[in-house]
Amino acid sequence: LYCRHSLVRSMALIVRKYGGSSVTRSDQIISIANQAKQTIERGDKLVLVVSARQGRTDHLIEMAKMVSDNPSKSAMDRLISIGEDVSCAWLAIALEALGIPCETMSGIQAGIITDANFGNANIIEIHSQEISRVLGENKIPIVAGFQGVTRNGELTTLGRGGSDVTAVAIASELSADICEICGDVDGVY
């Protein structure tokens, strides 16, 4: 796993996002958990944002196509958003195995408010109280990227690349010192 680590030292608040290719295998999840442990052991606060496992969203889209030629956009958002929830839970299990307190959060629980453009929603604002509460309890919030909720309570997805957008928006809202976008790559060009 490649993750550019900053040289900032002094109890930084870091938002770190892991993409789908980084959360596909158990050894990757364990590596992410160990990196998170190192981060908090040096005194930093950490928010993790995760994508669905590589190929998972496409698989869920194919599942919908098996039963309908024209599913509603809101139903599709409910279906394809579950991949991120699975990644959050899997990572939480790995962190808990290392004795690291954490709490998983859907986009809704994280307070990510969007417009109603299902399948390609835009973040309007973030109500970060729950993320701040978890950080204040010295836990790692693990936020499902790609998800949000309308002001009417309807689940939305942000479209491809939405987990990156989620991480940057959370970092901005929390005035984080660092926002890291991590991936599983052979090298950096």
Where are these regions (language model features)?
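Nucleotide/pyrophosphate-binding catalytic subdomain
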Residues: H5-Y189
